[in-house]
Amino acid sequence: MQHSGLSVAFAAGTRPVGTELTASIARLMAELRELGSAAVDVTSVANPSAFARTLNDKALVVYVVPDAAGEAEHGDLREFVRAIRAVNAELPLFLFGEQLTARQLPTEVLREIEGVINAYEDTPEFVARTLQREATRYVERLAPPFFRALTNYANDGAYSWHCPGHSGGTAFLKSPAGTLFHQFFGENLLRSDVCNAVEELGQLLDHTGPVAESEARAAETFGADHLYFVTNGTSTSNKIVWNSAVGPGDIVLVDRNCHKSILHAIMLTGAIPIYLMPTRNRAGIIGPIPRSEFDPAEIRRKIEAHPFIADKTRTPRILTLTQSTYDGIVYNAAEIKRTLDGHVDVLHFDEAWLPHARFHELYRGMHAVDDRAERTERSLVYATQSTHKLLAGLSQASQILVQNAESSRLDTNIFNEAYLMHTSTSPQYAIIASCDISAEMMRGVGGHALIEEAITEAMEFRRAIIRIGDEQPEGDWWFGVWGPDTPPREGLAERSEWELTSEQTWHGFDAVDDGFTMLDPIKVTLTTPGLSTSGEFGESGIPGLVLSKYLAEHGVVVEKTGLYSLFILFTIGVTKGRWNTLIAELHRFKRLYDRDVEVREAMPEFADEHPQYAELGLRELCDRLHAAYRGFDIANLTTDIYLDAPEVALLPADAWAAMTSGRIEHIAIDDLAGRVTAVLLTPYPPGIPLLVPGERVTERIVEYLRVEAELAAQFPGFNGITHGLGTAADGTHTVACVVE
């Protein structure tokens, strides 16, 4: 693998380094530079933990031990070595001094270093070559198999006579617009954009060569028996799992709070769904499915009551559970596996939002695939994970994890037929490489350090929001964070702090089982004044859409907007600067709101797009929208529409077949009640399907759609989106329904 000049860092404690030793270091640095390495001048390290996190681009570290080092210096040395090894177990570490010997140095330090350099023994030339060799070995070991093969291929300079047609990027250089594209994305990305004709890279579709090696290495990292990279997101991973396991007429257990890809899989396979119903608070946050819903006896009762299941004795083929929910509710996966083992053939945990759980003890037992826990006896276990969501994969990077049961093994031939069905024969190799690298980043102590840092930053943000709120004068307002009533204690999070219990009220859920769920602290719901979790509106309020539009205009884009909340993710890429900038913008919004500054000043771009708001004060705009929400009782309406399961008139696959064969008609909202929908009807927010194809529209749902239409008419720019809701030529909102 080719690489640019190696970088060697020199560091020392806070005690001064003598003149002669400084001169020896300078000679060694000069020799390293002669060999092509970048030698960074000695850094005096006061905070070893912070320094350790700056070394990701370094190939080797030399720690300088001053003359006549005593116990105090050895204490600094111990702390330095511990800090390095806490984040990187492999980085070569050498000690440099005048008369260093193993007899003098602490044993815990000697265990962690590659060598000791005495300044006046070997020549600087020899020592430089030794360091260069160790640094090179380290860098050569860094790249996992597929990424190494891809970079080698891109660097070889081979002419491309295969697709893609841009031929390593040269086609772009034949056009002015194409040149802009080339300049933006760069040579490496375009040279590595190849097709499956390049045999030395292996085959994603057949899981051979370097691809297979990297998948096997990632499986070891994530504790799985098998792991497969997927390049079209976890939507595709879910469909692969389903098409490998589910057939027409199979009984399937599905979290009603599932991603739409699961509902698409139901339509594709012709399965008969039985839904497990989650709780929900009046602020619009989706809660957990009660423990009772997983009871095999309760599942059997639902099978008995289902009108489309003829043979009531059949075993459900698959369970799919959203783990975690969008808002961060995580289930006790170990308990669910024990409860349903043998009662369902396949246990599938959609962990699109939980790929990090394996790497920190806070989540022990809360993720599906775990080689440190007992296997299931009979039920095969899958987890589908979006490595692009919370880890470092590029968009669409996903993976499928499989854990065999004691008496049930994955049939790789059947699985790969489903994999082929849903995977492009022209996958994007940069996405494969990002799957490879994001898994490698989580390997060893580095993965734990990354997740611990994300948790720590999220906790610091939560503490900061709570502290600022506590410091506001009585009667003044500030933002909140949805979470335990007691502010997070200093230090790392404890599981018990984040477990949901029936005695707590902060979550707002009616039915909570002790020891069954927790809130993931890195998923932060920032709340605005105006609505409680019990659905009570305040006299005034700040709707979430106003705040999110303000923040977006000022460079802060959030993950999701609720009625009176914003959802933000503390991924492994979040920094102190980023979340402190968010807090600064929240302060600025508060100042503008309190002064009732005109919208055209507070949000000029939004005012240009929607001039009807330009001369309104920011507080006045919030008051008007809040009054409308309150008048329509929108919080309780948007909760109630999800509480009762609609009547099932057709199986989803049959309703979809009516759509594809043209046996549908587009029905206006006022005429919808009692009709059978042919499409998924999904309001955003929250993005949870309200109706599945084949279900009858209720009066309450019609009322909700009318209210949404009225709000959109009254407040253009602040309307939500309902997927599945169409618009006729005359502007009437319609839904595609099955002809009866």
Kindly label every feature range from the protein language model:
Residues P92, D225-L227, G249-V252:
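Short active-site oxyanion
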Residues T14-P16, A68-A69, L95-A102, E121-T123, ...:
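Short beta-alpha junction loops
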Residues V45-P48, R53-N56, R78-R82, P106, ...:
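Conserved PLP-enzyme active-site core in the AAT-like
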Residues N188-T236:
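Conserved N-terminal alpha-helix of the aminotransferase class I/II PLP-enzyme fold
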Residues T14-A23, P66-D76, Q99-A102, T325-G328:
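Short acidic, S/G/P-rich loop/turn micro-motifs used as interaction or catalytic elements
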Residues L6, I25-L28, E34, A46-Y63, ...:
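Non-catalytic terminal extensions of PLP-dependent enzymes
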Residues R15-V45:
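Two-component/phosphorelay signaling modules centered on CheY-like receiver
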Residues M1-V8:
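Non-catalytic signal-transmission and effector/linker regions of two-component phosphorelay proteins
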